[in-house]
Regions:
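Glycine-rich phosphate/ribose-binding loops and adjacent secondary-structure elements
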Residues: 195, 199-339
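Ordered alpha/beta subdomains of enzyme catalytic regions
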Residues: 1-220, 246-248, 329-339
Length: 339
């Protein structure tokens, strides 16, 4: 993703980065080489580990840093900034060095002139804090799933566009196998997927008609949402009927059902028995509906028969621990000899 084509994010910084930068310039300290470390003080959910993410966006941002004339005029209008400093910003480019752990590992040192090092603080922290939080949460969720597939389903509950798109990317780094967010697939290559909502079922004269139309449209590995009306009395029986009528004559065996409500342990146990008895041992069972690592672990311990989890709001918002807590701290200043 080319950030410069989306928007100029150079001004996405805390105001004091600019006032400190102006002060450094006035004091003749703009070329003083500094070192800043990004680190965090505690891991989310007392989980024992954290996953670093957000490096790609951080590097993109830094490589595109520049102040345009609109930015310069805005700052001039604040009547706080030295004209020499504004000229400095007009020609601003980041020339520092950055060391970071690779994304997806259990964070970053910036070496740059003081003004440059201050100006990048806000974006680096907001990006690394957010994506590391989501990647860590995703890893906890996927560990709880014990090898079963986990997909990120949270866009509609995310706290803004970037939280949805970049959060899905971070979830992929953390261990999710794909996302429901199409834009994340388009921009970053994270596999997008999805099937149907309850509205699809409601659009047809009957649940059977809805399932039949879907399987005829997408016969290769369709997944049917079976809980719109009654999971055990109509949803699963109608799914089996349609699998027999549409898939079986074509020699197709890959298919699935999804539950989005109810007692997941009880319903999936019943569903597995019904599908197996009908000869559809190949049918996968998916579940969604406000899941997280705690619920997943609990229902699996109860014997739930689930092959795939769709995890949404509690992953994309990291609901149980909503702040990562990374900080950006000055750790060293180079002297004239480079020491």
């Amino acid at each position: 993703m080319d950030i410069s084509k989306k928007t100029n994010l150079t001004m996405l910084c805390d105001y004091y980065e600019l006032t400190m930068g102006n002060g450094y310039f006035v004091q003749g300290m703009q070329d003083c080489i500094t070192y800043f470390d990004i680190f965090f003080r505690s891991v989310p959910d007392n989980g024992g580990f954290a996953i670093a993410a957000g490096l790609e966006q951080a590097i993109e941002y830094i490589s595109q840093l520049h102040f345009d004339e609109a930015d310069i005029e805005y700052l001039r209008g604040r009547k706080m900034f030295d004209e020499g400093f504004l000229d400095y910003l007009r020609n601003f480019r980041f020339t520092g060095d950055i060391w970071a752990v690779p994304e997806g590992t259990p964070i970053m040192t910036v070496r740059a002139p003081a003004i440059q090092a201050q100006l990048v603080e806000t974006f680096l922290l907001l990006t690394l804090n957010h994506q590391s939080l989501i990647a860590t949460k995703a890893n906890r969720v996927t560990r709880a799933a014990k090898g079963r597939t986990v997909l990120e389903f949270g866009s509609r509950r995310a706290q803004g566009v970037d939280a949805a798109v970049d959060g899905a990317r971070a979830a992929y780094i953390g261990g999710c196998k794909g996302t429901a967010c199409t834009l994340t697939d388009q921009l970053y290559g994270v596999p997008a997927g999805g099937t149907m909502a309850h509205s699809w079922v409601q659009m047809f004269p009957s649940e059977y008609d809805a399932f039949k139309a879907y399987c005829e449209t997408y016969p290769d590995n369709p997944t049917l949402l079976v809980d719109t009306y009654n999971t055990l009395k109509s949803g699963i029986p109608n799914a089996i009927r349609v699998f027999n009528e549409v898939l079986k004559p074509r020699g197709l065996t890959k298919c699935g059902i999804r539950l989005d409500s109810g007692d997941m342990t009880y319903l999936t146990k019943k569903a597995r028995k019904m599908l197996d008895a009908a000869g559809w041992q190949s049918c996968k069972i998916s579940c969604s509906n406000s899941l997280d690592e705690y619920i997943i672990e609990d229902i699996l311990n109860q014997g739930a028969q689930i092959d795939l989890f769709g995890v949404g709001e509690r992953l994309i918002t990291a609901k149980s621990e909503a702040v990562f807590g990374g900080v950006y701290k000055l750790i060293a200043i180079e002297d004239a000899e480079g020491n």
